[in-house]
Amino acid sequence: MAKKSMIARDVKRKKLVERYAAKRKSLIEAFKSAKDPMERLEIHRKIQALPRNCAPNRIRNRCWATGKPRGVYRDFGLCRNQLRSRAHNGELPGVVKSSW
């Protein structure tokens, strides 16, 4: 089980990303379309003025059962340990143990 403070921090980041998504996207589009270097510099400063945690790449994929940050399978949202135990118990529909 991950520390509750780290899970809470990640939840806080997700809320910030949602809140600033439109503003961040419009600034990035304006930055890409700007030709004048001074205009680009001004837009870049506005992007830098946004909160650091509103960038989507700062969100960590976490297991929804345990909150572990590593070894998380995107398809299931589970860490490898939980995926294995739930697959063995038959709690994941369509997942069968491989045998040949």
Swiss-Prot record:
Q: Which GO terms describe its biological process?
A: translation
- RNA-binding recorded as keyword: yes
The Gene Ontology terms for molecular function here are: rRNA binding; structural constituent of ribosome
Which Pfam families does this one have? Answer: Ribosomal_S14
**GO CC annotations?**
cytoplasm; small ribosomal subunit
Q: Which domain of life is it from?
A: Bacteria
State the PANTHER family in the record.
30S RIBOSOMAL PROTEIN S14 (PTHR19836), SMALL RIBOSOMAL SUBUNIT PROTEIN US14M (PTHR19836:SF19)
Record function comment: Binds 16S rRNA, required for the assembly of 30S particles and may also be responsible for determining the conformation of the 16S rRNA at the A site.
Quaternary assembly = Part of the 30S ribosomal subunit. Contacts proteins S3 and S10.
Instruction: Give the protein name, as stated in the record.
Output: Small ribosomal subunit protein uS14
Q: Which source organism does the UniProt entry give?
A: Prochlorococcus marinus (strain NATL2A)
